[in-house]
């Protein structure tokens, strides 16, 4: 025994793998008995320490990964980008789903890796961490769901739910996440109950197919083997694959033999291989054993129980079946915890080693599209790629069929992904149909890419010929499903609501529309019939016994009212302008009154200077339309812009010095540079000419005029010129050329020579359309609009002083309301409308215009009492039927499809909500700041009484930037009715207020109303709520944006052009909504709103071009292939699919492709005969290895280690049958018959004409039913059929396997004492004695395909030939 001082002490954690290595080392060096005695001691120690430690799992042990927060945010950011590209029409719905799956699966995998790293750093002895690597009931996947994220789930149909579960069980799931998680949990519970029996049945089938495999020989003499392609970066995998194997050939290093053939590989041998060689190592395998019915000792290798060569006579087949089937039962118990969770593989990427420019030959690549919709290039063959950096060049080789994600000559950064490598084995795929549904009513349209002719008559199914966009253009269809002919109107006719459209042939169904509310008005004095008005009209009539007055309320839904502190602004969606509301006189506007102002941010000054007018024209005030506001009259009468043009600012820098002139360090008319000291404390921040002047308060002011001093050659002629503005491109003194506008100023000092000072000038351009009109109600017969008037705030030649840190506006824009007097009276009422829903509320401006219809002049001054109730209700009828005619519910323009020739044509009504008007003017951005001071008035816009309070605030507000407005919908407006009101006719207008159930509401009230009205709100549950009345804060919501001068070269979309979302016109800042241009005006565009859908090649369109579409209709069916998604319940269905070799399995596909590839390669080198033979043999070997790797991959994903040799025994039995072809001898076997490979080899050795056969891959069930023993087949399944066929054929069971001997009660042919084993050993000893007396050479590695004899020294006698033929004939006769 060694001295204690010489003992080696290892202070490290012993995990399961390390303990297994110690056990193997002990058994190798000391034997099983000593190793058992040593291992009893750590076992006892382990139980003692586990009892003392009492390791248990608590909720505090569940530690969340710190990196989860930013990983989730990054994934959500990528999801938002995918959603934007999908809305733009750049992605298919399938590509969007793929991006989402790839993003969240990658996030989940990174989170899982971070979880293991976090446990290993912070708390390695954490019970949760130890459980994940214990190999018992827990694994990394289960722990990841406890502390990481549950991830994507699969529904019962196997479809992936596109809403990932971001939470884990430690944090708790939300309601939505819990419902989604129940899909997988329910699937897990079902699998726990059902898959347990499947696991047991799988074990039975595995044992059934290999039960006769017994070790009978020491060496079969084969020279074949399999190659172990190893990567020394994963030493653990190399140890598991090589230890216990036997070498198939010698291993050489530099002509030195490192290991001999038939030498078993132990730990020391593997260490030599890892340190000295990197070549693939060929080892013997059960799948390449030459034994016909059994297996040899060297092809199997070590026994896993004692670390030595397996004993002859051991039933390794049953051991292999049990070792593969038994883990399936254990894995089934994990189903409940992880059921339904989606798993996949991250694609293998190529990253750049350093920064540089990519260079490759572009002739070998062609453009394509990735599965996520990104542009890429695919290479035909292996592509040589070079990265040219600053100091060195890196060369990379990209495999064939890989996707390049970068362009040629593109600059890349270090570790950037440049290529995606295609997997060698094609993964299993399935064909999926994804349906795209419409989310709005309208009309379907497409241009190219779709087959317009259907395959069948009267069919609306159209396939796509290539990738194209399918548009859904917004519109309202009263003629649902094209059931009625449009007989009264033609295309482009304008109609009003309640207009008869067509004759009714039958009473159509009344579809429900949950979002449509109607208003019923009752008048008990005139008529008992209810009159229904939809809120699309927004025009309501109050009936009484003597007259009728119509009150038209215009709600500016393109704008909303934004409140900043105490000030209200108008905000528009498609231009970045805010307008300050300026409404006076109790909220009453007269014709041509202004109601909102803003200062254009483009025309703001940040530096002092002199203003010079250019081509711009200024007019005087319009005396006929003078405003009643003195403030408005003051600046309107002097500087109103009549015609657009340009004006200029000549900048200058001003400094105010002390009262003493001597304190100024520079003299007058002297040129200074930047940094020159003007006074002792002031330095010049610009270069130019110094001008000193005296102010009124006896202080001296210093101005720096930027420019260059030039002394001309002829000062007399120059003095005749006055100061002028010189445009770009003009020459000065025939020496200089101007690059920009300059202000040429002449300076004449008192005592010095006169000189010229060219000063830079800043040009401002304003559009010629200084006054424009926008009609508020498109497609309505109302001559109502707003004018935009621009005003200059400074006169020509005025010096503008800008205080540091502030901006001075140059132009102010006013919005002026105007209408035709033939329709309305002289007044319009403005009120604030607040529309409140459950989770949101918005403010709008409402303008009430009062006009009269057949009103007697004598009764206009009388009091009119009208009693009516407005009730909110929901109607199911989408259109009204009157006298068998279809009545329109909408007001707009008829759009009739021209794709159908019959009388039943699709019709769409374009209403105001379906269209949008976009100005061609150029917008700009300058949103209001957070520090804006606001104001409001509790009075009815009586600003005259509040000027003293808010004067200073308003001055600051007017110096702010302009603001933008946002388009909103008026679909959520609710109405109230007045039970008893008493008003003057000339001031009569109805009331609309914002609503909120069971709350006190603020009601707008006009001061000219004689009696406060009583308001009642009726909600959707017919509940009546009384609301109190208060004074109204009346605001004007007339929405418009401030125009700016247009630029030359602006590209306007053509008529009929389709615009995608956020389409930006050239050189403008306007982003247009998606839709189609249906009208082009000189000042604006009319766009019909729509939504694009991208359809790939082969997709199916479910409607005709121009056909009407309802919300929820199926539009497109996308057909695509996707990888089969698995879950981590236990991998049992995947293993069963592989072992049964179903047609959906990728192994059969790989065998066929491998055979073709090897056949073509071999024919070029060897010839046809050898090429077919070797390609069939090698393709079968490759198929066997692929199948072994796929089965091993499923079990490794669950942390289960299975020896490859056991899987190879199963795969050998699956590939041991061959299918006879028609070229065979008919007397021996019929075409299509399954025969064993050993039987075919024996027949070909003795027959003159060989049998032609093809390799085939059988499942374990079919392989079990095609053995030589009918007793074994009958005991497995289909007993009656198997026994009946065996009796008819006269088959004889030779009892070669273990199962049939157990059934008949005989001794099983296994074990060291078996007679067959003893006879086989005796025969081997005789062969060894004979071979020792003769020289023998094994020949080359590639054996002769025509040499089928296993023994070379004895020629078969005639009796042996007859026995073999008799046995073969009898076996074939039984199979017929």
Curated annotation (Swiss-Prot):
<feature type="binding site">
    <location>
        <position position="289"/>
    </location>
    <ligand>
        <name>Zn(2+)</name>
    </ligand>
</feature>
<dbReference type="GO" id="GO:0009536">
    <property type="term" value="C:plastid"/>
</dbReference>
<keyword id="KW-0808">Transferase</keyword>
<dbReference type="GO" id="GO:0006351">
    <property type="term" value="P:DNA-templated transcription"/>
</dbReference>
<keyword id="KW-0479">Metal-binding</keyword>
<dbReference type="InterPro" id="IPR012756">
    <property type="entry name" value="DNA-dir_RpoC2_beta_pp"/>
</dbReference>
<comment type="similarity">
    <text>Belongs to the RNA polymerase beta' chain family. RpoC2 subfamily.</text>
</comment>
<dbReference type="GO" id="GO:0003677">
    <property type="term" value="F:DNA binding"/>
</dbReference>
<keyword id="KW-0934">Plastid</keyword>
<dbReference type="Pfam" id="PF04998">
    <property type="entry name" value="RNA_pol_Rpb1_5"/>
</dbReference>
<feature type="binding site">
    <location>
        <position position="296"/>
    </location>
    <ligand>
        <name>Zn(2+)</name>
    </ligand>
</feature>
<feature type="binding site">
    <location>
        <position position="220"/>
    </location>
    <ligand>
        <name>Zn(2+)</name>
    </ligand>
</feature>
<dbReference type="InterPro" id="IPR038120">
    <property type="entry name" value="Rpb1_funnel_sf"/>
</dbReference>
<keyword id="KW-0804">Transcription</keyword>
<keyword id="KW-0548">Nucleotidyltransferase</keyword>
<feature type="binding site">
    <location>
        <position position="299"/>
    </location>
    <ligand>
        <name>Zn(2+)</name>
    </ligand>
</feature>
<dbReference type="GO" id="GO:0003899">
    <property type="term" value="F:DNA-directed RNA polymerase activity"/>
</dbReference>
<keyword id="KW-0862">Zinc</keyword>
<comment type="function">
    <text>DNA-dependent RNA polymerase catalyzes the transcription of DNA into RNA using the four ribonucleoside triphosphates as substrates.</text>
</comment>
<dbReference type="GO" id="GO:0046872">
    <property type="term" value="F:metal ion binding"/>
</dbReference>
<dbReference type="GO" id="GO:0005739">
    <property type="term" value="C:mitochondrion"/>
</dbReference>
<dbReference type="GO" id="GO:0000428">
    <property type="term" value="C:DNA-directed RNA polymerase complex"/>
</dbReference>
<dbReference type="Pfam" id="PF05000">
    <property type="entry name" value="RNA_pol_Rpb1_4"/>
</dbReference>
<dbReference type="InterPro" id="IPR050254">
    <property type="entry name" value="RNA_pol_beta''_euk"/>
</dbReference>
<dbReference type="InterPro" id="IPR042102">
    <property type="entry name" value="RNA_pol_Rpb1_3_sf"/>
</dbReference>
<keyword id="KW-0240">DNA-directed RNA polymerase</keyword>
<comment type="subunit">
    <text>In plastids the minimal PEP RNA polymerase catalytic core is composed of four subunits: alpha, beta, beta', and beta''. When a (nuclear-encoded) sigma factor is associated with the core the holoenzyme is formed, which can initiate transcription.</text>
</comment>
<dbReference type="InterPro" id="IPR007081">
    <property type="entry name" value="RNA_pol_Rpb1_5"/>
</dbReference>
<dbReference type="InterPro" id="IPR007083">
    <property type="entry name" value="RNA_pol_Rpb1_4"/>
</dbReference>
<protein>
    <recommendedName>
        <fullName>DNA-directed RNA polymerase subunit beta''</fullName>
        <ecNumber>2.7.7.6</ecNumber>
    </recommendedName>
</protein>
């Amino acid at each position: 025994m060694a001295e204690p001082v010489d003992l080696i002490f290892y202070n490290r954690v012993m995990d399961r793998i390390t303990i297994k290595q110690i056990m193997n080392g002990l058994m190798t060096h000391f034997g099983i008995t000593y190793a058992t005695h040593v291992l009893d001691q750590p076992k006892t120690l382990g139980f003692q320490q586990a009892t003392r430690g009492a390791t248990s799992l608590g909720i505090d042990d569940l530690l969340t990964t710190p990196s989860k927060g930013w990983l989730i945010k990054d994934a959500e950011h990528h999801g938002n980008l995918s959603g934007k590209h999908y809305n733009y029409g750049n992605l298919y719905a399938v590509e969007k789903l793929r991006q989402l799956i790839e993003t969240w699966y990658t996030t989940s995998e990174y989170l899982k890796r971070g979880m293991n790293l976090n446990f290993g750093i912070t708390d390695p002895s954490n019970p949760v961490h130890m459980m994940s690597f214990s190999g018992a009931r827990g694994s990394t996947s289960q722990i990841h769901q406890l502390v990481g994220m549950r991830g994507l789930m699969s529904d019962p149909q196997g479809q992936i739910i596109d809403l990932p579960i971001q939470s884990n069980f430690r944090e708790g799931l939300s309601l939505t996440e819990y419902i989604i998680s129940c899909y997988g949990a329910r699937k897990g519970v079902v699998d726990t109950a059902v898959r347990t029996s499947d696991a047991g049945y799988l074990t039975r089938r595995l044992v059934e197919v290999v039960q006769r495999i017994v070790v009978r020989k020491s060496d079969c003499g084969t020279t074949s083997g399999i190659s172990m392609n190893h990567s020394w970066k994963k030493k653990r995998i190399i140890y598991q694959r090589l230890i216990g194997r036997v070498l198939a050939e010698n291993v050489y290093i530099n002509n030195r033999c490192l290991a001999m053939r038939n030498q078993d590989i132990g730990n020391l041998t593997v260490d030599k291989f890892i340190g000295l060689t990197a070549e693939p190592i060929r080892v013997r395998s059960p799948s390449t054993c030459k034994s016909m019915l059994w297996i040899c000792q060297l092809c199997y290798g070590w026994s896993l129980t004692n670390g030595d060569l397996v004993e002859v006579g051991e039933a390794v087949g049953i051991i292999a079946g049990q070792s593969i089937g038994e883990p399936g039962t254990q894995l089934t118990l994990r189903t409940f915890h992880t059921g339904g969770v989606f798993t996949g593989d991250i694609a293998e990427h190529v990253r750049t080693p350093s920064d540089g420019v990519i260079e490759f030959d572009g002739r070998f690549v062609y453009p394509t599209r990735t599965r996520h919709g990104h542009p890429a290039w695919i290479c035909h063959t292996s592509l040589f790629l070079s990265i040219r950096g600053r100091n060195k060049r890196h060369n990379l080789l990209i495999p064939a069929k890989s996707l390049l994600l970068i362009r040629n000559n593109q600059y890349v950064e270090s570790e950037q992904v440049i290529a995606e490598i295609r997997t060698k084995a094609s993964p299993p795929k399935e064909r999926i149909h994804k349906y795209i549904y419409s989310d709005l009513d309208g009309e379907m349209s497409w241009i190219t890419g779709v087959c317009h002719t259907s395959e069948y008559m009267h069919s609306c199914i159209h396939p796509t010929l290539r990738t194209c966009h399918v548009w859904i253009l917004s519109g309202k269809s009263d003629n649902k499903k094209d059931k009625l002919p449009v007989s009264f109107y033609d295309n482009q006719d304008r109609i009003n609501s309640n207009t008869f459209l067509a004759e009714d042939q039958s009473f159509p169904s009344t579809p429900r529309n949950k979002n449509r509310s109607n208003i019923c008005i009752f008048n008990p004095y005139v008529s008992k019939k209810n009159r229904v008005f939809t809120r699309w009209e927004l025009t309501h009539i109050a009936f009484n016994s003597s007259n009728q007055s119509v009150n038209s309320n215009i709600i500016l839904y393109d704008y909303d009212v934004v409140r900043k502190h105490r000030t209200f602004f108008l905000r528009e969606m498609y231009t970045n302008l805010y307008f300050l509301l300026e409404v006076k006189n109790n909220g009453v506007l007269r014709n041509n009154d202004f109601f909102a102002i803003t200062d254009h941010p483009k025309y703001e000054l940040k530096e002092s200077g002199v203003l010079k007018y250019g081509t711009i024209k200024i007019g005087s005030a319009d005396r006929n339309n003078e405003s009643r506001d003195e403030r408005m009259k003051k600046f309107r009468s002097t500087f109103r812009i009549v015609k657009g043009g340009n004006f200029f600012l000549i900048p200058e820098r001003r400094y105010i010095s002390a009262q003493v002139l001597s304190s100024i360090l520079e003299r007058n008319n002297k040129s200074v540079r930047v940094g020159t000291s003007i006074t002792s404390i002031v330095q010049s921040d610009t270069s130019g000419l110094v001008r000193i002047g005296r102010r009124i308060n006896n202080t001296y002011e210093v101005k720096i005029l930027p420019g260059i001093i030039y002394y001309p050659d002829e000062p007399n002629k120059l003095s005749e010129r006055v100061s002028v503005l010189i445009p770009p491109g003009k020459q000065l003194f025939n020496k200089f050329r101007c690059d920009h506008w300059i202000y040429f100023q002449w300076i004449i000092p008192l005592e010095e020579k006169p000189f010229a000072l060219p000063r830079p000038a800043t040009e401002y351009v304003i559009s010629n359309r200084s006054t424009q009109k926008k009609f508020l109600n498109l497609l309505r017969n109302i001559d109502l609009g707003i004018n935009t008037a621009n005003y200059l705030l400074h006169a020509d030649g005025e010096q503008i002083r800008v205080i540091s840190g502030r901006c001075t506006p140059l132009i102010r824009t006013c919005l002026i309301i105007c209408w035709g007097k033939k329709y309305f009276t002289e007044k319009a009422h403005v009120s604030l409308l607040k529309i409140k829903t459950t989770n949101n509320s918005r403010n709008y401006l409402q303008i009430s215009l009062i006009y009269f219809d057949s009103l007697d002049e004598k009764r206009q001054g009388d009091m009119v009492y009208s009693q009516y109730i407005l009730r909110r209700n929901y109607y199911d009828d989408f259109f009204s039927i009157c006298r068998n005619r279809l009545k329109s519910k909408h007001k707009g323009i008829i759009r009739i499809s021209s794709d159908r020739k019959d009388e039943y044509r699709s019709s769409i009504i374009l209403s105001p909500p379906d269209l949008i008007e976009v100005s061609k003017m150029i917008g700009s951005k300058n949103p209001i700041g957070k520090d804006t001071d606001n104001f409001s008035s509790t009075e009815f816009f009586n600003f005259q009484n509040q000027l003293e309070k808010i004067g200073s605030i308003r001055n600051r507000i007017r110096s702010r930037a302009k603001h933008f407005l946002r388009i909103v919908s008026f679909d959520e407006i609710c109405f109230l009715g007045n039970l008893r009101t008493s008003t003057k006719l000339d001031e009569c207008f109805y009331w609309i207020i914002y609503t909120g159930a069971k709350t006190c509401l603020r009601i707008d009230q006009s001061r000219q109303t004689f009696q406060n009205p009583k308001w009642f709100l009726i909600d959707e549950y017919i509940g009546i709520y009384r609301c109190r009345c208060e004074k109204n804060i009346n605001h004007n919501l007339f929405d418009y944006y401030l125009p700016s001068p247009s630029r030359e070269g602006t590209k306007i979309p053509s008529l009929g052009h389709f615009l995608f979302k956020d389409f930006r016109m050239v050189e403008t800042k306007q982003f247009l909504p998606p839709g189609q241009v249906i009208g082009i005006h000189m000042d604006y565009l009319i766009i019909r709103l729509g939504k694009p859908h991208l359809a790939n090649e082969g997709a199916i369109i479910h409607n005709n071009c121009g056909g009407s579409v309802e919300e929820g209709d199926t539009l497109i069916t996308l057909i695509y292939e996707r990888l089969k998604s698995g879950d981590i319940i236990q991998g049992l269905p995947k293993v069963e699919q592989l072992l049964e070799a179903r047609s959906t399995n990728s192994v059969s596909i790989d065998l066929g492709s491998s055979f073709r590839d090897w056949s073509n390669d071999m024919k070029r080198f060897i010839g046809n005969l050898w090429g077919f033979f070797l390609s069939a043999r090698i393709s079968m070997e490759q198929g066997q290895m692929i199948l072994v790797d796929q089965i091993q991959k499923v079990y490794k994903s669950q942390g289960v280690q299975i020896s490859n040799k056991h899987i190879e025994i199963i795969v050998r039995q699956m590939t041991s049958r061959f299918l006879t072809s028609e070229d065979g001898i008919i007397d021996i076997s019929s075409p299509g018959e399954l025969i064993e490979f050993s039987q075919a080899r024996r027949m070909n050795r003795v027959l003159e004409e060989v049998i032609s056969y093809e390799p085939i891959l059988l499942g374990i069930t079919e392989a079990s039913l095609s053995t030589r023993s009918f007793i074994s087949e009958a005991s497995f399944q289909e007993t009656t059929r198997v026994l009946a066929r065996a009796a008819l054929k006269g088959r004889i069971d030779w009892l070669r396997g273990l199962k049939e001997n157990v059934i008949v009660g005989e001794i099983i042919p296994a074990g060291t004492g078996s007679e067959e084993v003893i006879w086989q050993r005796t025969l081997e000893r005789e062969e060894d004695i004979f071979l020792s007396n003769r020289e023998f050479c094994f020949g080359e590695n590639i054996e002769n395909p025509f040499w089928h004899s296993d023994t070379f020294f004895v020629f078969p006698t005639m009796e042996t030939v007859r026995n073999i033929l008799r046995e073969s004939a009898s076996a074939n006769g039984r199979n017929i």
